[in-house]
Amino acid sequence: MSQQLWMERQKAFTGPPQLTETTTTANSRKTMARRSRTKTKLFFLLISLIAFLAFVPVFAPLPSFSSHYSLSHRHQHRKVVTSTVAVKPGSFEIDDDKFWKDGEHFRIIGGDLHYFRVLPQYWEDRLLRAKALGLNTIQTYVPWNLHEPQPGKLVFEGIADLVSFLKLCHKLDMLVMLRPGPYICGEWDFGGFPAWLLAIEPPLKLRSSDSAYLRLVDNWWGILLPKVTQFLYNNGGPIIMVQIENEFGSYGDDKAYLHHLVELARGHLGDEIILYTTDGGDREILEKGTIRGDAVFSTVDFTTGSNPWPIFKLQKEFNAPGKSPPLCSEFYTGWLTHWGEKNAKTDADFTASALEQILSRNGSAVLYMVHGGTNFGFYNGANTGVDESDYKPDITSYDYDAPISESGDVENAKFNALRRVIGLHTAASLPSVPSNNGKMGYGPIQLQKTAFLFDLLDNINPADVVESENPLSMESVGQMFGFLLYISEYTPKDDKSVLLIPEVHDRAQVFTLCHSKENSRRPTHVGSIDRLSSKTLGLPNAKCASNISLFVLVENQGRVNYGSYIFDKKGILSSVFLDGRILHGWKMIPIPFHNLNEVPKINAIIQVALSRSITVSTQTGLKDKSGNVSEVPAFFTGHFFIENADQIQDTFISFSGWGKGIAVVNDFNIGRYWPSFGPQCNLYVPSPILRHGENVLVILELDYPSPELVIHSVDHPDFTCGSSKSK
């Protein structure tokens, strides 16, 4: 207790002093002094308030997600439960800490299923399986980079046909929670941002109220949101909620940014749709990631197996009174897997028990994922550890150990366990479970080397070659995915040289070529430098009479999609040093592989490789001097036949025994393989990619092919390859 407080309490017990002339005069002086001090305090308080308002943003009130209906309407809800009052259909609202659909109490039992990870021909199949699990809602991201891969180049067809996906959800009576970003995370390249944002100068401040960034977001949402307005529930469609950003509290603290997104969404979607945020169930994260009150509905996610109810109690603090139905908007059924790790698995009964904790007390949950699908093309994301160099790219499969497997299988323990729990909390009987789709192994496929990558450089359009004094990033030369070849020259010396590339994203294969030597048509592999390991490489003494050409082939293995290092440019991002001196004079040659959503679908470089299947293989040696298949990036092609149309079924291509590369089946990029690192051995090939008769497989092997030059088409997945073997 302070001395001042102790003295004040003592005075209270001694009673008032006797009033004399002296004490009266003294009291008068004290009164005047108090008035003077009061005026001084008010002056400084006013100055402090002005300073506070000058530096702290004051936002205009945001519209409530429930402001369109009145208290009398809320009372109607309670009556409708007993079917005494009819309510206009097409309303999805929150009141009394519950969801209300057309006036009826409603519980969300949903699941994430991303249309861009499943071929359109299989959308209905996967949705019906989700429905058989007992789900009533589908949640999906919308990746900006899929729909606008180049500035102003819009793609809303094929696997990017969001409108058709929404129509199908509506047809199957599945509600939708839409997550349009602009940032989505989702183990998707760059968190869904288009890579061309990285080429803008000065650099954008992503996920912020930076005006340059917001102008681009305004433009993108100005294209996207009008397309989905007709599908809002209040307009007769399936969309019941639209998410603002994604787990923003784990990244930043910029309320002006969140307010801008809310106002932008309201401007396009109107005041009736519920806007929501998703953040981890932590007070500090929620403070930064959402907006208190009823402008948005704050939802939470948390580790599966955590006690959900203290987190739901915390959730209520960030929502307006009566506006916080408990909802875990990402209930994790499994987890992601990086290259070099064991395949992530979670126990079926443990997962089902965790879901039971939520549903048993009338909570809602969205399974992340109900069906993972596949990172086709070059769209896999990546994570970092303690720093930017601790780089971990995701595998091609996004199976996620979800109840519906990558290939759609449902005959598994997790599907059954979750369905049993959901069935206990669903009034209507669940739909019957479809059987697994058929799988077919088409056997061994003999490959032949058709062309070395370097042999095809003459087919690159000269206008696409960029020259610069110093290396440029992939984004700066317009190569957003795949590979970029850097070429320079240096003067040889008598002993070895040391090459240093301080910053390369993500993996560089180094080759040299002495033009004065006989049979020097093709560069020789020297070694590799990557983001994780040593940045130096010894270059052998070539004893070359001319300058030596240095070739550095850089692979973009997937941009970081989460955390502080999402501004993840690719290519050589620093000077290149040779024996301590900067190497100048560079050519950069894009290697034009198509990504998932590119038009036209025919890949020019693949067609060139196929056309040279005879001439190149006969004119050039396939092996080095020691008789081994040379470690130079090369194209291999193979053919397999499907005799009858009814034999066209899903298959898996096994790359066991091969090194690292990409695979294309019938001009469709099925993704990356890396069995030498693991754990994924086989790539999934959905049946719609295949055709009756001849099917063509083309692979670019970067490291070393199997000596037999054989791969196998099998009827099952396999995640037991590499040093991190797992069943």
Regions found by a protein language model. Name each.
Residues 6, 12, 41-48, 214-228, ...:
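Carbohydrate-binding surfaces of carbohydrate-active enzymes
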Residues 107, 134-136, 170-176, 233-240, ...:
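Short, well-ordered coil/turn segments that N-cap beta-strands
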Residues 114-133, 151-170, 494-503, 529-535, ...:
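Aromatic- and glycine-enriched glycan-recognition loops and surfaces
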Residues 236-323:
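Gly/Pro-rich turn-and-neighbor structural signature
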Residues 82, 87-121, 128-132, 158-165, ...:
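Extended substrate-binding grooves/exosites of carbohydrate-active enzymes
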Residues 122-191, 195, 262-272, 387:
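Aromatic-lined substrate-binding rim segments of carbohydrate-active enzymes
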Residues 1-39:
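Short, low-complexity, Lys/Arg-enriched N-terminal segments of secretory-pathway carbohydrate enzymes
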Residues 496-514, 550, 640-666, 673-674, ...:
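Aromatic-lined ligand-binding clefts that engage carbohydrates, nucleic acids, or primary amines
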